[in-house]
Amino acid sequence: MGGSASSQLDEGKCAYIRGKTEASIKNFSPYYSRQYSVAFCNHVRSEVEQQRDLTSQFLKTKPPLEPGTVLYEAELSQFAEDIRKWKDRYVVVKNDFAVESYENKEAYQRGAVPKSRILPAGGKVLTSEEEYSLLSDKHFPDPTASSEKNSQPFLVLPKAFPVYLWQPYLRHGYFCFHEAAEQQKFSALLNDCIRHLNHDYMKQTTFEAQAFLEAVQFFRQEKGHYGAWEVITGDEVQILSKLVMEELLPTLQTDLLPKLKGKKNDRKRAWFGLLEEAYNLVQHQVSEGLSALKEECRALTKDLEGTIRSDMDQIVNSKNFLTGKIRAMVAQPAENRCGESVQPFLASILEELMGPVSSGFSEVRALFEKEVDELSQSFHTTQDGAQLKECLDQLMKLPLDSVKMEPCYTKVTLLPERLLDLQSRFRFPHVDLVVQRTQNYMQELMENAVFTFEQLLSPYLQGEASRTAVAIEKVKLRVLKQYDYDSSTIRKKIFQEALIQITLPTVQKALASTCKPELQKYEQFIFADHTNMIHVENIYEEILYQILLDETLKVITEAAILKKHNLFEDNMALPSESVSSLTDLKTSMGSNQASPARGASAILPGAPGDEAPGSEVFQGPEEKQQQPGVPGSLAREESASISGSSPPSGEDGQVSVSGVDNSAGNPLSADNSAGPLSSHLSEAEAGEPPKDEETAHKRPESSAVPGSLRELKELLTVTVFVESAPEIGNDTLNGTPVPQEDKKEEEEEEESKIHPEASGPAAIQQDSCEESEVREREAHPMPLEAEAPGVNLGTLPEGRGPTSQSTGEGLTENTSCLGPIEEPSEAQGPTEEVLLATVSTQDSTEAGGEAVHSVTVTPQEDATLSSNPICPVENNEGPQVSEDQEVLGGNDSPALAMDTEQINDAHVYECHWEVEDAPSADILDVHDCDVGSPGEW
């Protein structure tokens, strides 16, 4: 039969293994202790500064599965090493990715201890005898194997479809199936388990995990090993155990391999058993030693926490000072080395990475769309809500369906072939780790996509079948748009990590002999109390990393600008990062794999009759309550984006509002009110006759080319129509009515002159003004309706500041009372500046600046339009007050006092108001709107 592994590993050899393990842990301890303190200090700093991850994401993140969730269970044939026979076992794989084997299904159900439990971290899955023999021979350095031919197979298979699980330092697993489909399902599942066990620990963000990985890196650099390391897979105990085994392996091969007797297959089996016994011994001792080391570090940081928190500013300043010193020494040689050995190859490496990675993510997108289309088609056929829920539950399991996801993963497996030259140029043989990490990201993105789809669709499952069918299609398009953006973000992250992982070891190794010895002299700049929190080696590595990061970001940004593989730029104008429901962001029916910014635009619903069929599925309960006519919060938000000026009388009651991009803080500054985008003139401004009510409600269709300048203009323009009757002005001297046409002529004449002087003094009683406004609102409500030509303003990015919010509240509450006008001595200076700012929209636009909000309002009923207290007033003119307001003011308080010698018959009030962004609500429905002063908005 051959030698037994247990007989070769005698007590002396076990003692030797324990001694080597203890020495390795002792050598590793200083690195871990230093990195533990540094990582803990960084953790406290991020906690104090409340640092957050700025990575944007549209899709909802799927919560983790409940512990103990079963991913796979089936009865199959497994080779039992203890009895060296094939046995039928009941195999169960849960979401801890351990492969557990039970005697039978009944034993599993009653909670029996599994016969075997395999954690296949670092393993490889093979499905043919030839592939397995090649791999196992590679890790069996038998000196006599070259002269011996192995005619017999390693195992006699009881069934036609085997699965081999190769593992480093552990016995291999062997499974058999009757059908190829079962073989494919189990092998795909094992690959999923290996990927997650290899990389899930490295994805942890705890400071202890970061400290351990940094310690392993510095520990290996002292031995001349740089960059990625194939055995950094699994958890911290597995990683450190493999570190020890890496040192033990040459000795074990020298001492034990020559003693093995028998045929090649027997010696091979004995060697693998010997390695497993040694590895288990090392792993047990490493687990104990690492636990003790952690307790020491926790006690140390507990004592340091007070110092870290109290001296945080000093620690940060000291580190920044030290960073500047070391960067001055390192920057030039690092940049030279990067320019010679790295920068010329970054673009070509990125090009080779982008193809397979992007094709894999595109395959995931296509799979999601295909599954949703099948779900939709099934619902169209059956119209059964219960069956739809079952299909939706199956869709939620799609990311865990290894067979369906495998074609997506296969697209990325082309990377090793595309990057063959990396092994010779950059000594990076571990492209398979990049492949596995990419596949994990693909599975995670699919999980988020199906979870977002289910969350957005669930409110509409109980409705009518026709509405549910429409909702399925619209939700699918929404999720696909969000997927495109998140896919671009994740792929750029993958490219960044891969480029740095590939090229950083080259720079580190090149500078190790020249720059690293110089680091010791910089330790004198560290305070004695801060030596545990600041280490020059960490700062040195951070500087090298940042230099390479800047170079990689350049090539990735260039690829995004060129739209390669549907990558999006980082500075795209996007809607909010969190989309909680269909009402948050409308998606047009014709959307496909377009930019999220383009997907954000949709049709703004106007009157209820204009709404597209099926669009009600996008309206939440709150939105539906606000639509019938109550202004509500949406109306207040809309009104915050509308600015107005006192209009010439006699024109049609139309308001033209032009959006302003990056408007300045002072809304009355002429310098900040001109822009390259010209404002759209309303029909009243163009001198055209007013249209009837039906025309006012009709939604114009945009003919602008997508992405053109005209489309941008339309995105920034909204037209508000005011329906009102002709107004008869009141002479403020004697209360006699003044014809509106005469007032218009006088106002146009005075407006052409524009006297840069302030009006005389005036005093207003607030109580009487409020009472008059209340009565005016009750008698003459003035609805405003907004239409945006071809654009959904609700999808524009929200950018309201405190000013715009207060503006919206003021307009909705109709606080349009006149405030006290300042004395001439106080108001003359600022009034002259303000008056110069009251230029027309067209003039300011032609001057070349930012686009201006121009508002023209002409009420045609007896509604009161109060002028702004800060608006410019013509010389020797006072505010215009209606007859009703004058009478009401006399009931409760003294009438409006004005100097009759300083008041003319014509009254012109020009005011220019600006808001930063176009409104983002879906409906602008402001009733009883009297244009108040900006100070009250």
Curated annotation (Swiss-Prot):
Entry-annotated residues carrying Phosphoserine: 578, 581, 595, 601, 646, 708, 768
Parts of the chain that traverse the membrane: none
Source organism of this protein record: Rattus norvegicus (Rat)
Keyword field: Cytoplasm, Lipoprotein, Membrane, Myristate, Phosphoprotein, Stress response, Translation regulation
Regions of compositional bias (Low complexity) in chain numbering: 640-651
Compartment(s) of residence: Cytoplasm; Membrane
Further comment: 'Niban' means 'second' in Japanese.
Membrane topology: Lipid-anchor
Protein function: Regulates phosphorylation of a number of proteins involved in translation regulation including EIF2A, EIF4EBP1 and RPS6KB1. May be involved in the endoplasmic reticulum stress response.
Annotated Basic and acidic residues bias: 688-701
Keyword Phosphoprotein included in the entry's annotation: yes
Tissue: Detected in brain, lung, spleen and skeletal muscle. Expressed in small renal tumors but not in normal kidney.
Principal subcellular localization: cytoplasm
Gene Ontology biological process terms, A to Z: negative regulation of protein phosphorylation; positive regulation of protein phosphorylation; positive regulation of translation; response to endoplasmic reticulum stress
Compositional bias annotation for Polar residues: 584-595, 655-681, 802-817, 855-869
Top-level division of the source organism's lineage: Eukaryota
Single GO cellular component term: membrane
Covalent lipid adducts (N-myristoyl glycine), residues: 2
Name recorded for this polypeptide: Protein Niban 1
Residue span of region Disordered: 584-710, 724-891
